Design a protein with these regions (language model features):
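Primarily EF-hand calcium-binding motifs
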Residues: 111-113
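Small-residue-enriched hydrophobic alpha-helices in membranes
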Residues: 2-109, 123-211
Length: 211
């Protein structure tokens, strides 16, 4: 599976969906089902995430946009530090993680954030089972992630001491948790702590995202 492509398609689908008004006789689920196969599975995942994040997720139409917001937040954070070092975007992004690994952990975190205050409803589960018949590997992976989302501890282990990726991961989760229910607040607090993000950096990430 190409997680970079999947994440990019999910972000783009959510962004496009937010700018459209469905036909009165056609629900989002109906539209997705007509696509079929793997594309429908990506559409279903977009629907699950978009339902939680709403307009917030339209701010990041790509992994590059997510990285740009995280970099701007880190720059603002660094300016307020006693010993600050100006980093270029390339220096900030220097990481041992491949783009595929970054996309994987960001996508898994977004799913965990979306499910932090509830579970997938039965209709959505049934649609995933039905539409995944043509792409069993992706269907199996998605079903597993939705049934047992990644924990904040596991996320932190995958991220390691990569500040750029940690910032992007937190930012992606925050954009999904638009409503900030009690359980979402707890999830985000635990995520920030597990990622070892400074409170002031978290504040800058939220400000740059428009919260």
């Amino acid at each position: 599976m190409n997680f970079n492509q999947i994440l990019g398609t999910v972000l783009d689908t959510v962004k496009q969906s937010a700018g459209k008004v469905n036909k009165p006789s056609e629900s989002t689920a109906d539209t997705i089902t007509k696509v079929g196969g793997g594309a429908a599975l990506v559409g279903l995942l977009s629907m699950v995430l978009g339902k939680k994040g709403g307009s917030s997720l339209t701010k990041i139409g790509s992994l590059a946009a997510l990285g740009s917001i995280a970099y701007q937040a880190y720059q603002s954070y660094q300016k307020n530090q006693a010993q600050s070092t100006d980093l270029s975007p390339n220096q900030f992004e220097q990481t041992k993680h491949s783009e595929e690994e970054r996309s994987n952990v960001i996508l898994r975190t977004m799913i965990a954030a979306a499910l932090s205050d509830g579970v997938l409803d039965e209709n959505e589960k049934a649609m995933i089972e039905q539409e995944g018949q043509n792409q069993p590997e992706f269907q199996q992976w998605l079903s597993a992630e939705l049934s047992q989302p990644i924990s904040v501890t596991q996320i932190a282990q995958l991220v390691g001491n990569d500040v750029a990726l940690a910032s992007q991961v937190y930012l992606a989760a925050r954009l999904v948790c638009q409503e900030l229910s009690r359980k979402e607040i707890v999830f985000l607090a635990q995520l920030a702590e597990a990622l070892n993000l400074d409170d002031k950096l978290v504040e800058q990430l939220e400000q740059q995202a428009g919260f």
